[in-house]
Every structure is written in structure tokens, then in C-alpha cells.
């Protein structure tokens, strides 16, 4: 496998820490050891997160193309767009963000706090669009790209989650290589890796990276899209493309893509009772915060799988904490009493 042939622009602090979740593990019976790899602490750029790791492989291409404007898309409380805005500010580039109405959640301050507030503070041109949730290529985003061209700019396209970008899976191939180095350092080996999946390139990159040591199907995706067929197709397609890019040396099969669909409801962006219980439990036992859109759902999935005995006794499970906490203020009514 050859990830090193791709240029990488450093936007993160370096390897992200792995934290034992001792109190949560004990609370759930102590038969499974839970750990978190803190991608939410990976950068000094506006709280970082998993997209910042991905952007390290997109930015060299943007610079080579002499782009002057990063153009991306997400929901109103998109972590992706906040991270793109931060990187643009860091590099002295312009930024155009299309923010679609992906979540059926009505709150008078939803489009004025959290991620979108931070993007505006960093100088991004934020464009609110009423279109609903979809993980594919969006017309509103293509129109934004064209508008930059018409104004004389040189736009660089960054699709939702970086996922449909040809290089979007590379960052989390690097994640797997980083985990292997940390396993060697700490003298342990993780039996499972739990990760939230929506647009797919995070899990796709992990599948390719862990396929190198036989653990592709030990990457357990927790769907948060509530459109799992689309998400599974996108994960599989991106993983196969990424495997070719890095010369993995074997095909990615359908069996390599594990996506648990039990925890996404009621729909994208809206928590269920299990989501909220997991958010509060992790916060109160570990001081680790998760959000109702993504990480709360993957935390719910991991906790429930432990309770159901779906991880063998003695298993070591690594939870990939991808970020998302800046969106919590947009859901303040839900957590008014904690």
C-alpha cells in the first residue's frame, strides 16, 4: 500500500490521542474495553474534526490548481463547511459555503449559532438554500461553483463530506496507518473500530487502511443518514476507488463494508431516545461530548452493541470520535436541562 506518494498539507497537530473510556466500559459490565481516538481534537483550526484530516490531501491539489476560493456544501449545521471555512481562512483563500436545509428541526436560532456562526465569523460567504437532505452531488453547489467563475474567481470544488472528491478517502487510510503505529507503541490491538457513516469517505478510507492487516470488516459503520442504501453504495464505491489509488493489492468486496442501520432514526439530524441517552451517559461518565447528528448516534450504536453482547468478551473496541460538538448549541432546547 502506498499512501506516501500523495502530497499532504499539514492542518492537524499530528497523531490524534487514543483515550481509554474506563468508566463507560465499567458501567457497561467491564467485559469489553472501550477506547476513543479523538479526531475531534486533531487541529487548532476551528475545533478540527474528521474533515480536516481529509482536507490535508485535497489542499495540495487546490494549491497546484492555483485556486483562490474553496467551495463546499452541507446542511445548516454542517461540520464540513465549518472546517472548510477554517482551512480557507488559514490559507488566505476565499470560501463559499452552500448550506442546505438538511434537517427537519425548527428552532429560531438554528441558522445563527454553532457551526454556521463560526463559518460566518471566519469570513465565509454563507448561502442558505432550502433544498433537503441528499448525500450526492447537488445542483446548488454546482451553481455556487459557476458563480465564482463568473465573478472571475478560481473555485476549488469540495463536495459534501469531501466524499465524492477523488482524493476524499485518503485521509482515513492514514488514520488506519496511524492506529497501527499507536497499537505497536501501546502493545495492544483493536478488535473493532466503530465509526459514524453518512457521506461515506471516512469509513471507506478506514476500510482500505485496515484491509492492509485483515481488519476491513472489523470497521463497524453506524449509519446516521437514515438512507442506508445510498450510504452503503457510496462507501463501497469510494473504498474501491481509494484502494486503487493506494495500490492496496486486493479488491474491496461487499463483505468488507459493514454498516449497522439500527441507530439512524427517526431521520437524518434528529436524535432518538437512544441517541440522547448515549450523549448524556458519555458526557457524565467520561466528560466526553458528542452531538445529536453524528457522534451521538455512533456512540449509541457502540453502547447498544456492548449491551447486546455483539462484541466478544475481552474485545478492545476503538470509537472514532469524528467531531461535531460545535453543533450542540443549535440543539440547546433539547439539552436545556442537561
UniProtKB/Swiss-Prot annotation:
Catalysis: reaction(s): 1-aminocyclopropane-1-carboxylate + H2O = 2-oxobutanoate + NH4(+)
EC number: 3.5.99.7
InterPro entries registered for this protein in UniProt: ACCD_DCysDesulf, ACP_carboxylate_deaminase, ACP_carboxylate_deaminase_bac, TrpB-like_PALP, TrpB-like_PALP_sf
N6-(pyridoxal phosphate)lysine PTM positions: 51
Annotated GO MF terms: 1-aminocyclopropane-1-carboxylate deaminase activity; D-cysteine desulfhydrase activity; pyridoxal phosphate binding
Disulfide bond positions: none
Cofactor(s) for this UniProt protein: pyridoxal 5'-phosphate
Residues annotated as the enzyme's active site: 78
Keywords from the named record: Hydrolase, Pyridoxal phosphate
A single BP term in Gene Ontology: amine catabolic process
UniProt cross-references to Pfam families, sorted A to Z: PALP
Alphabetized PANTHER family for the sequence: 1-AMINOCYCLOPROPANE-1-CARBOXYLATE DEAMINASE-RELATED
Assembly mode: Homotrimer.
Family, similarity comment: Belongs to the ACC deaminase/D-cysteine desulfhydrase family.
Biological function: Catalyzes a cyclopropane ring-opening reaction, the irreversible conversion of 1-aminocyclopropane-1-carboxylate (ACC) to ammonia and alpha-ketobutyrate. Allows growth on ACC as a nitrogen source.
Protein name as annotated: 1-aminocyclopropane-1-carboxylate deaminase
Name of the gene this protein is made from: acdS
Amino acid at each position: 500500500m502506498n499512501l506516501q506518494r500523495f502530497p499532504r498539507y499539514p492542518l492537524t497537530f499530528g497523531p490524534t490521542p487514543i483515550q481509554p473510556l474506563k468508566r463507560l466500559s465499567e458501567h457497561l459490565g467491564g467485559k469489553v474495553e472501550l477506547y476513543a481516538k479523538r479526531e475531534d481534537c486533531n487541529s487548532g483550526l476551528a475545533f478540527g474534526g474528521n474533515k480536516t484530516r481529509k482536507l490535508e490531501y485535497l489542499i495540495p491539489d487546490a494549491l497546484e490548481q492555483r485556486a483562490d476560493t474553496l467551495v463546499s456544501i452541507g446542511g445548516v449545521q454542517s461540520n464540513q463547511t465549518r472546517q472548510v471555512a477554517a482551512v480557507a481562512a488559514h490559507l488566505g483563500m476565499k470560501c463559499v459555503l452552500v448550506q442546505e436545509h438538511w434537517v427537519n428541526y425548527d428552532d429560531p436560532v438554528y441558522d445563527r449559532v454553532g457551526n454556521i456562526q463560526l463559518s460566518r465569523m471566519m469570513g465565509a460567504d454563507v448561502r442558505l438554500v432550502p433544498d433537503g437532505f441528499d448525500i450526492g452531488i447537488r445542483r446548488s453547489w454546482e451553481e455556487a461553483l459557476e458563480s465564482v467563475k463568473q465573478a472571475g474567481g478560481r473555485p476549488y470544488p469540495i463536495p459534501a463530506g469531501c466524499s465524492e472528491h477523488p482524493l476524499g478517502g485518503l485521509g482515513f487510510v492514514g488514520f488506519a496507518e496511524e492506529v497501527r503505529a499507536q497499537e505497536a507503541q501501546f502493545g495492544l490491538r483493536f478488535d473493532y473500530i466503530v465509526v459514524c457513516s453518512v457521506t461515506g469517505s471516512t469509513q471507506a478510507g478506514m476500510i482500505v487502511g485496515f484491509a492492509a492487516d485483515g481488519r476491513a470488516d472489523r470497521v463497524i459503520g453506524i449509519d446516521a443518514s437514515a438512507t442506508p442504501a445510498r450510504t452503503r453504495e457510496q462507501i463501497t464505491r469510494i473504498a474501491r476507488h481509494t484502494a486503487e489509488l493506494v495500490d492496496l493489492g486486493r479488491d474491496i468486496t461487499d463483505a468488507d463494508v459493514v454498516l449497522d442501520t439500527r441507530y439512524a432514526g427517526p431521520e437524518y439530524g434528529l436524535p432518538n431516545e437512544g441517541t440522547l441517552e448515549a450523549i448524556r451517559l458519555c458526557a457524565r461518565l467520561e466528560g466526553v461530548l458528542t452531538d445529536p447528528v453524528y457522534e451521538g448516534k455512533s456512540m449509541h450504536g457502540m453502547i447498544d452493541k456492548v449491551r447486546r453482547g455483539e462484541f466478544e468478551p475481552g474485545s478492545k473496541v476503538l470509537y472514532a470520535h469524528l467531531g461535531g460538538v460545535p453543533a450542540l448549541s443549535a440543539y440547546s432546547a433539547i439539552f436545556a436541562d442537561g
